[in-house]
A protein has these predicted regions:
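Cys-dependent condensing catalytic cores that perform Claisen condensation/acyl-transfer
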Residues: 5-225
Length: 225
């Protein structure tokens, strides 16, 4: 075997252990256990579009391709996306109102994932923990920065709605010192986040990595598209 072959030979990688999980899925599956139970029971978590998202009947038409309308009025929706324990995270009610529910949700789920893995967040302060979050729709940002509603813009609008903060707020709040990346590769975003987390662990860049994804649709436009 020549030197070139030796260089090109792939070295075996240390297996990556998944030690904790946190989640939110339609059908009130708010933990790994409830999600597994839902799958085993064959529960259909698809429901009518909630009224607090949009009036589905106003946009419904069986005529596929009709501009401004959609041939569906159902989907997979999370419950209580407006609820957030701001006091727990030391965030004022005023600032919390500007924060994208996707950011709020990620803070809660990260805490739950660490607990699920038997990790104490205080013990991870300053650690080389990487955060990799897949994203897609950023509608809360569009809603606040609308030309028609500039009065909604406030002192926390940027940090509350920018996509990069989906990962950065986690790293900042928990004081993680590893890489902090929010990425968008459409439907593969969460999978790519896991891939990058593994690469970070294998390279020695991170000692611990959090990988996940979030996508909350507030308005009908993305479904229309």
């Amino acid at each position: 075997m020549n030197n070139t072959a030796l260089k090109n030979e792939k070295k075996p990688r240390t297996p990556v252990a998944i030690i904790g999980i946190g989640c939110r899925f339609p059908g009130n599956a708010d933990s790994p256990e409830s999600f597994w139970k839902m799958l085993c029971s064959g529960v259909d978590a698809i429901s009518e579009v909630p009224q607090d998202r949009w009036n589905s009947q106003a946009f419904y038409s069986p005529d596929i391709g009709k501009p401004g309308f959609m041939p569906i009025h159902q989907g997979g929706f999370l419950s209580n996306i407006d609820l957030f324990d701001a006091d727990f995270f030391g965030i004022s009610p005023r600032e919390a109102a500007y924060i994208d529910p996707q950011q709020r949700l990620l803070l809660e789920v990260v805490w739950e994932a660490l607990e699920n893995g038997g990790l104490v967040p205080a013990n991870l302060v300053g650690s080389r923990t990487g955060v990799f979050i897949g994203k897609f729709a950023m509608e809360y940002h569009l809603m606040q920065f609308s030309e028609m509603q500039r009065e909604l813009i406030g002192p926390h609008s940027s940090t509350g709605t920018l996509g990069t903060l989906l990962s950065n707020r986690i790293s900042h709040w928990f004081d993680f010192q590893g890489p902090s990346i929010a990425l968008d590769t459409a439907c593969s975003s969460s999978l790519v986040a896991v891939h990058l987390a593994c690469q970070s662990l294998w390279s020695g860049e991170s000692d611990l990595a959090l990988a996940g994804g979030v996508n909350i649709i507030f308005k009908p436009e993305w479904t229309l598209a």
